[in-house]
Amino acid sequence: MLPSQVRNGLKANLETIKGMRVYELIPTVPVAPAAIVGQLDFTFDLNNARGLDQANLDVVVLVQRFTERSGQNELDKYLAGSGDFSIKAAIESDLTLDGACSTLRVTSAEAGNYSSGDIEFLSYRYRITVYG
């Protein structure tokens, strides 16, 4: 399982969401609305002698903070478990990421803020577990 292939696969899945800018590498200054695919943390050899590895990573979804209400409403549509704007549904639309892994699962989404330079965004941090 190569990190670059996993990131590229996640980017392709997330690009199915209309209007979403997707970064497979952490940008200096993102343009919202955006999904940023983070770096992978690996656990090797879960199943004897190179049989299975596990990677965990975050995808941060952020929106511009125009006002609290409008920013939160924009962000909430991405949190839905299904539908055209669902981050979870988009990520899990191809569980093998075009062969980059065996399977994956979105395990959680945590609300927060994301800062880049002088700009603060509203965000959700999606935790993903990938096996391969």
Please annotate each region the language model reported.
Residues 37:
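Two-metal-ion RNase H-like nuclease active-site motif
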Residues 1-31, 41-132:
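Charged, amphipathic alpha-helical segments and their flanking helix caps
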